[in-house]
């Protein structure tokens, strides 16, 4: 049980929902430069399993690490934190 709780959890923004049951989530993190101490923004995209196709473009979502579901998918959708507003 404790092993399941040690899985990585990220919060990011959906940048693509064109695939069936798959979304692409952009996760932005900050790291401090070792020499200069300046915070530098890094971003990474994760393909995420969305069983019900519930997440839409621009939504803020929480994803969790899981077993490999395909060649590129290693995360699953936990919840939609905030839905995007379409103007």
Swiss-Prot record:
Gene3D superfamilies: Nucleic acid-binding proteins. GO terms for biological process: translation. One of its GO terms (cellular component) is cytosolic small ribosomal subunit. One of its GO terms (molecular function) is rRNA binding. Transmembrane segments: none annotated. It comes from the Bacteria. The keyword Aminoacyl-tRNA synthetase does not apply. Keywords: Ribonucleoprotein, Ribosomal protein, RNA-binding, rRNA-binding. One of the primary rRNA binding proteins, it binds specifically to the 5'-end of 16S ribosomal RNA. Part of the 30S ribosomal subunit. Belongs to the universal ribosomal protein uS17 family. This is Small ribosomal subunit protein uS17. It comes from Staphylococcus saprophyticus subsp. saprophyticus (strain ATCC 15305 / DSM 20229 / NCIMB 8711 / NCTC 7292 / S-41). The lineage of its organism: Bacteria, Bacillati, Bacillota, Bacilli, Bacillales. The gene is rpsQ.
